[in-house]
Amino acid sequence: MAIERKFVNDGFVKASMDEYFAEQLNRAGYGGMELNRTPMGTQIVIYSEKPGMVIGKAGKVIRKLTRDVAARYNLENPQIDAQEVKKPELNAQMMASRLAASIERGWYFRKAGHNTLRAVMNAGALGCEVVISGKLTGARSRVEKFVDGYIKHSGNPVDEVVDEGFAVAIKKLGTLGCKVRIIQPGVVLPDSYTTTEPSEPVTEPVEKPAEKPAAKPAEKPVEAPKKESAAKPKTPAVAPEKPVETAEVAEPEEAEEEPQAEVAEDLEEAEVIQVEGSEELRRQVNGVWQHKHEGYDYWHPMARVHKEAKE
């Protein structure tokens, strides 16, 4: 039981100290405190909208607070530090104190609640909830809630990411409780997720293998051209034509081979002779007599037997 009592006692000291600072520093815009116990002493950090009023002239106010805390809560060597809150709209305790002050000045509770909610959301909060409870408009007490954004109500995230502040507004009909709960901007919630669009696949260019240069064929040694012999080229053999059987010709003579290609020099040297009384032309080439006449207008051996036209 000793350990449990120690934790309960520490919680009581922290809660009562918070109420004491809120009462003493109401005009300075009190915004909460932090309590850290170290071997060197107890460090107390006070967050305020006007840290100059917390310190006082020549440190008069902060020295008085240090003496009172050491005497009330039996703390050894307490050290108090005052820090300024840069965005009061995101501090739940400050906004609850402002809401209570506006209601005490005579503002309608619904107008005061909406103004507080709008100021918190415009500061960039993820969510905000304003709860005003008490005798609002009649003899019976009731509760009015103003919610905007996203708010967690249960689980471990409530203790970690939700900032909560409370203040009391005193009116003629009775007291009104003003509670403000804020989720700070940039907080990562357990159920939050983000979706990313799939990126386009990057197609890498396919590199073609480098083509090897074709191997050059081995050059064959060039042979010197052989000298042509002085002999004249032979003419191709021509199949002999079958002799036409006639009564006048007893034995057919074999047709000589027809030269198809002749050397230009021999053709130029051959002399052409014309037979008297006819159009027949004759010449001698390589010892062979050739002629051409009517019906056979090309040079051919004279020994060739011509086919007679059938009647």
Curated annotation (Swiss-Prot):
Pfam families cross-referenced by the UniProt entry: KH_2, Ribosomal_S3_C
Family: Belongs to the universal ribosomal protein uS3 family.
Taxon lineage: Archaea, Methanobacteriati, Methanobacteriota, Stenosarchaea group, Methanomicrobia
Start-end of Acidic residues biased regions: 248-267
KH type-2 domain ranges (all copies): 17-86
UniProt keyword annotations, A-Z: Ribonucleoprotein, Ribosomal protein, RNA-binding, rRNA-binding
GO biological process: translation
Residue ranges, annotated region (Disordered): 190-267
Gene that this polypeptide is encoded by: rps3
Protein name as it appears in the record: Small ribosomal subunit protein uS3
Biased composition (Basic and acidic residues): 205-231
Organism, as annotated: Methanosarcina barkeri (strain Fusaro / DSM 804)
NCBIfam families per record: PRK04191.1, uS3_euk_arch
Residues annotated as signal peptide: none
Quaternary structure and interacting proteins, as annotated: Part of the 30S ribosomal subunit.
Compositional bias ranges of the Low complexity kind: 194-204, 232-247
SMART domains given in the database record: KH
GO terms under cellular component: cytosolic small ribosomal subunit
One Gene Ontology term of the molecular function aspect: rRNA binding
Function per UniProt: Binds the lower part of the 30S subunit head.
